[in-house]
Structures are given as structure tokens and as C-alpha cells.
Amino acid sequence: MWVYNNWSSYDELSDNIPLTEELAMKELHEMIRLRKFGIHFDYYMMDAFWFAPDGGYRTWRKLNWPDGPDNWIAACKENGLLPGMWFGTNALVHINAAPQWKDSVGTSGWTMSLSEGGFLPDFMSVLQYWYDRGIRMFKFDFAYFDAATAETQKTMKPEEIRKRNETALRESLAKFRAKNPDVMLVAFNGFGGDVESTAGPFPFHNPVDLRWLTVFDSLYSGDPRPSDVPEMNFWRSMDIYSDHMVRRYEESGLPLERIDSTSFMIGNTGTIYYRKTNAWMGMLLLEVARGGWVNTIHGNLEFLDEAKARWFARVQKLYAPLEAEGRTKAFGGIPGDVEPYGFGSLDSTGAIYTVMNPTQSVEEIELPLLSRVQEPLGGGRVIFRDAGFVPEISGNKIKLGPGQLAAAGFGRYAGPEFDLGVEEDVQIPRSIALVEARFVSKGQNTIEATFTAPPKGDLRIIFQQRNSDGWITRSWPGGPPKGKSVGTVLKIRAEQNGKELPIATDYDRVIWSGLSWGAGEIRRGDFAEGQALTVQCSSAEKSPMKLEARVYSVEY
């Protein structure tokens, strides 16, 4: 199932690009354009902030939607698309409490109880109102089950309040589904899981209640953001974040097919770090390789030209039967623990293994059998890879370069017709070696190493910060559009013979989710071999931080 969501083509949280009817209709026309290249969508999800602040989710913003949603709903129907709508569940985000909700407003002033007052009954009538007008998918975001009025907080424990709110919503949604059996319900923020970091403890502090699967078709596993795994390519660290969260949700008991990684997001807005289509091929491949039955595509579809659209359609067609089989398995280590891992999908004719090496070394990864009836692996072929390092397959093992993504086909999928090419946006070194560089403290939150520059290769510097308790810690100098770039806090400097050396970086961005690391490279032609070279890594955080750094020699 393929869902187009227009978030990141606009952004009203970390940017100033509003949702308008013109923008929404433009993306609908792009969906139609992409059909001629073979791309298929089932749903069009209208994301956040379509609603008038005082309309109780029944009216649309007049300035941006002078005629309401009628034209959009009609155009979806005319073109065989099922429309969907975003709702902030019980949080007052860019919306005011309607009169009938006010006796549900909790002590926070911006969340509403789901088990007392008039909010939930009215909210369910809102959902039915939009279903009757043709809406077939409903997205639930920003759920806060701790919401309670002052009177309730005096008589009930927090865990009792949470349980009562969750039960009230789940039972109401079950009745809504029973009345409208063709509806799609998808859950986002607030329904369990800790999505802020890949370095957090597990099991989740906020556990996932598997009973939500009785009413929701999918649960999402976090908005795209960089992981706490440093990578020279910023977008690769984001791939690792989504992979990690899918694995953690699976470990929490969710089947892979019920997890929506929501990882594919293109756009030129703050929410997606002004990515446009950088490293988009690997992002799409991983979206389908993880095995989710709900595949959500976000952003500016006009960024997909004919060549990109045809490649997109090939991936979509390739994985359609594999996803339908529901025989996708995760294997290997945990992404956030910087261990090689992958996802394998199997049918009766063969298998595709999509494999990631998040480490700063060349690694050989064993590809496990995905089923007891699967034939031993042999005759495999690399059908997709990043540029640079050429992966090697030997029997049931594949060798990958540092930070590399690749896909290997076996059986029918080893045929040349399944070749997906090379991701040129991600360059992987053909060799990497650790340089002996001993970092020492040079004052608060600053470390430095002086070493002899190696005779070959560029120099790669990787560093990360931890708090005084040893936990990996993100710096957040402000999100877009007015925040500062993370490079103003997490800094890498290098000099040789009294001259500062240029350092190529990809991490120095305005990042709404924060960042815990820095990565940079000094090109071979910018330093002299055999002479002393000094590298300094620092954090401008006011609290004491523990910094860790490594230097590598890399050849492309």
C-alpha cells in the first residue's frame, strides 16, 4: 500500500512554507504525472494544519482554502485516489478548544482528556463527518494519554489516567472501524516508543501497547532524523536512524509489516533539512526493504524527473510481490549499536538482501537463510550499491565498505534485469585504516591530537559527545528557520605548520532534532605527509562533555 503525504513539500513547524490549496493540488497533479512512468499511489494524505483554528476540525483555513476541501476531494476521487486527513488527536496544536471540548481540557492547557468531558464523543463525530464526505484514511498524531482535568488528577494515579484514556480511544476507534470497515487508521507520535535518539535505553521507556494493532493498520517509528551513528554522509546516518527504529519497534513485538518507517521524505524545507533528493535511491530502497505494508512517501513529487520516476517505479514493482508475501526478516546487529545488519525478503523464486555496514571499517556480513525451506545461498549478485567500494559476494557472505549500503539478489533476483545501479550521491572509500592519533584534553569540552600525517589517503575525523554520565548527547542550537547550524557547537579544526587546513563536512546543518557527532575529511592535497598535523574537536555546550574522536586514512 502506497501513501503520498504532502508534509515536507510544506512545513509550518520548522519552516515558513504554508499548506495551501494551490500547493496541495500541484502535488496531486504530480501524482498523476508520475503514473505514466509506472508509479502507483493508493492514498493522498493531507497532513497537518489544513484546519481553521476555531473550527473544531470541521472547517478548513479560509485564507488558504477559500472553497474548503471539495475540489481536492473531488479530484482525488476522479483520479482513483483515496483521500486522507491528519488529526492532532487530543493535542491543541494550531487549533483552539471548541466549546464542546472545554470540559475536557487538561491542566496543561493544551491537551484534552479522552475519558472525561465532551472532547472524545465530538472527535468521533468529526471522524464520521469526514468519512461520510469521502475521507478513507485518518492519521492520528500528538496523542497525550496523561491528559486529565484538575479534578481527576486529585483522585487518580497517573497510570490509571493513562490506562483510562487509552481504553477510551481504543474502544471508540474499534466502533468506528466496525461501522466503516474500509477505513485506514494510522498512528504516529504518542502511541509508544522513544524516537528521539538511537542511543537511548531499550526496552522503551514509553512501551508500545500491542493492543493498538487491533485498531490501527500501522504504527510509525519516528520522523526522519540523523542517528547517533556518525557517518561522513549525513543522509546515510538518517538511513541508519530509520533502520534502528524499525528494529526496536520489531523487538517490542510489532510485526515488520505493521511498522511504517516514514523514512522517504524529499523536499526543500527545514523538516527534512533541505535535502531535496540527495541520496534518495538508498532511502527508497530501504523504505521497501524493511517490509512495511504501508509505505509513506513525503514531499515534493516534482523533484522526481522522468529518470528518477522510472527508477522509483522499478523498485516499487520489484518489491510489490515480496511485500505481499510478508516474508521479510531483519538480521544482523542493532543499527544504533554500530553493527552490520540488513533486511531480507523472500518468495518462492529467490530473495533480496539489503545490507548496511554502519561501521568505520570494511566488514564481511553473513546473510542468513530467511526460511527453513529456502535453498542454501549461492550465485548471488550485487544489484545495488553506493559508489566507490565494490561489494564482494562469496556464498552467503557479502563484504561492504565503511558506511555502505548494498542489495544482493539470489535465485531469480540475481538476474541482470533486476540491476538497480549505483547511488552516486554516496561515495564509499575503497580502503580505510585507523591512524594512530592520541587525543588529550585541552580544556573543557575540547580534545586535541598531534600525529604524523600518513603517506597516503585523505584524513577522516569522527567525533562524538557524551554527557558526564556517559550518555551520548545531542546538541541543539535551534531548529530551522531561525536556528544556528550544529557546526557552531560541534567543531572540528585542523592545522599543519601553523596553517589551518580546510575540512570537508556534511553535518554542519540547521537540524531540528539535534546532533551528537561531527565528521569531516581533509583532502590529500591539502596537507603534507610525514609531518606533524594537529586535529582539535570541541563542543560549545556549557555543561561538561566527554568527547571521543578517531582519525582514519581513507582512499576513494
Where are these regions (language model features)?
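C-terminal beta-sandwich/jelly-roll accessory domains of carbohydrate-active enzymes
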Residues: 328-339, 348-350, 355-556
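Short, acidic/polar
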Residues: 17-37, 117-132, 280-281
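Aromatic- and carboxylate-enriched substrate-binding clefts and catalytic-loop regions
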Residues: 40-264
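Conserved structural scaffold segments of CAZyme catalytic domains across common CAZy folds
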Residues: 1-94, 294-296, 300-336, 345-352, ...
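Short, low-complexity, polar/charged sequence segments that are solvent-exposed and flexible
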Residues: 23-26, 63-65, 102-106, 204-207, ...
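Hydrophobic alpha-helical scaffolding
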Residues: 17, 21, 62, 116, ...
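Active-site-proximal substrate-binding groove within the catalytic cores of carbohydrate-active enzymes
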Residues: 168-391, 395-410
